[in-house]
């Protein structure tokens, strides 16, 4: 049996860097980072056996979704706090894949705190399953200029003088489908060019450069990179763009896009609409009921996502978006339980016999959203030291994002929050 799925472009790249603790001779780097139907067979989605369905459900449930959502909300709010009066976007999925690879090389208390943050004791097994599932989101067929793509790639770049543990290498290859290459980090220019070329290729040009030569120190020994790339057009017709500007908030004016939404959500704190991409993922625009400043935590995002959506007609309005965010995540991650990975007590002995600890974790994101689709990119860098009855007439709902709002780009099928953000201005 064949099933139709309706398919903006999102790119996520996570880059993790390792450097030997002081006193070690090995060497990492400081990374800055119409309506087309896709036909998917039931056989491809699952093999039509009860066992396969159970496996899928078990794997989806293997990640504590409450933990994942709470972490995403908390991190987005922390980034917004240090970027007051600016739009922000954070990619939890990008960070999770970077931390997931680190967890494969961690031991003791370091492994425990990473597992707690990731909401699972075996992120690698989940990563392998998820990377296999998302290949069904891909199609070369274009919809208003956008192909449908959701791809993850991983790589480990080790200095020639650093010996990786066999078990770690095997897990990166088997579970993350990662490639492992050796570099001479003393040749900073060539090392950067090699890593940046990989990132440019795997993010289809959205992230052309991740690191610069001054990011690499004499202690640099390892760089782990993850890229997540998503591209798709909107399902159904494009949004209509207004010809004149209207107010956004109290002080700005902008042109809006209008459309019918696919789902409507409401709780005590917010109203929201979902608009599908062709591949079945969705954009969720969330409007606080109070008109003052807000945090995502205020809006009870988990409760909103778990509430039963209404399928009555919903009219939605929002501005086009084009902005980027850069953030250093060390203090934010330490505040929610990951201080161990930055300390001298960090245990990454599963990566190498040389002592290592995380020095800095950075993330840079970019979002471009218009009437035809969406493009978004994120780079996460962890720099380490080598330490149906008849329906009643529909009620028309409205969600007009004409003042500061929150948003998600969401994998409805597997319950993964790829991006979360807060919009406070249209002038960027």
Region locations from a protein language model:
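Non-catalytic, conformational "gating/processing" segments within enzyme and secreted inhibitor domains
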Residues: 30-44, 85, 123-289, 309-392
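C-terminal soluble interaction/assembly domains
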Residues: 363-365, 371-428
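Acidic/histidine-rich, surface-exposed loop or edge segments in extracytoplasmic proteins
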Residues: 49-60, 93-97, 111-116, 172-181, ...
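Short Gly/aromatic-enriched secondary-structure transition segments
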Residues: 114-118, 238-247, 296-305
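Gram-positive cell-envelope targeting signals
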Residues: 1-62, 79-80, 89, 207-210, ...
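His/Glu-rich zincin catalytic helix
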Residues: 58-119, 228-233, 276, 408, ...
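Short beta-strands and strand-coil junctions in structured, solvent-facing domains, enriched
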Residues: 292-293, 417
């Amino acid at each position: 049996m064949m099933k139709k799925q309706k398919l903006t472009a999102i790119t996520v790249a996570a880059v993790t860097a390792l450097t030997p603790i002081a006193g070690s001779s090995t060497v990492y780097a400081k990374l800055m980072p119409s309506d087309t139907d896709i036909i998917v067979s039931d056989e491809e989605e699952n093999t039509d056996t009860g066992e396969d369905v159970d496996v899928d459900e078990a794997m989806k449930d293997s990640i504590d979704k409450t933990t994942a959502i709470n972490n995403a909300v908390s991190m987005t709010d922390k980034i917004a706090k240090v970027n007051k009066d600016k739009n922000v976007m954070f990619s939890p999925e990008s960070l999770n894949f970077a931390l997931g690879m680190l967890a494969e090389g961690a031991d003791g208390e370091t492994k425990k705190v990473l597992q707690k943050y990731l909401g699972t004791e075996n992120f690698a097994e989940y990563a392998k399953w998820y990377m296999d599932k998302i290949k069904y989101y891909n199609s070369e067929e274009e919809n208003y200029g956008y192909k449908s793509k959701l791809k993850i790639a991983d790589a480990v770049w080790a200095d020639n003088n650093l010996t990786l543990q066999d078990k770690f290498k095997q897990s990166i290859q088997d579970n993350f489908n990662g490639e492992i290459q050796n570099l001479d980090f003393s040749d900073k220019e060539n090392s950067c060019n090699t890593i940046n070329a990989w990132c440019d290729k795997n993010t289809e040009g959205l992230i052309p450069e991740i690191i610069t030569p001054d990011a690499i120190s004499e202690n640099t020994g390892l760089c782990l990179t993850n890229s997540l790339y998503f591209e798709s057009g909107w399902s159904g017709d494009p949004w209509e763009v207004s010809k004149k500007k209207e107010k956004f908030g109290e002080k700005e004016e902008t042109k809006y896009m209008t459309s019918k939404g696919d789902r409507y959500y409401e709780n005590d704190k917010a109203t929201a609409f979902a608009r599908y991409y062709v591949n079945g993922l969705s954009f969720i625009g969330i409007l606080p009921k109070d008109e003052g400043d807000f945090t995502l935590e205020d809006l009870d995002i988990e409760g909103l996502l778990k509430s039963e959506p209404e399928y009555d007609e919903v009219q939605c309005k929002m501005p086009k978006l084009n902005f980027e965010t850069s953030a250093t995540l060390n203090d934010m991650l330490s505040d929610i339980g990951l201080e161990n990975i930055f300390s001298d007590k960090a245990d990454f002995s599963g990566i190498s016999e040389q002592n290592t600890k995380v020095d800095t974790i950075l993330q840079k994101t970019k979002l471009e959203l218009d009437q035809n689709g969406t493009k978004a990119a994120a780079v996460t860098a962890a720099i380490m030291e080598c330490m149906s009855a008849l329906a009643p007439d529909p009620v028309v709902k409205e969600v007009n994002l004409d003042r500061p709002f929150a948003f998600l780009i969401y994998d409805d099928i597997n319950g993964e929050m790829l991006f979360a953000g807060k919009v406070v201005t249209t002038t960027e």
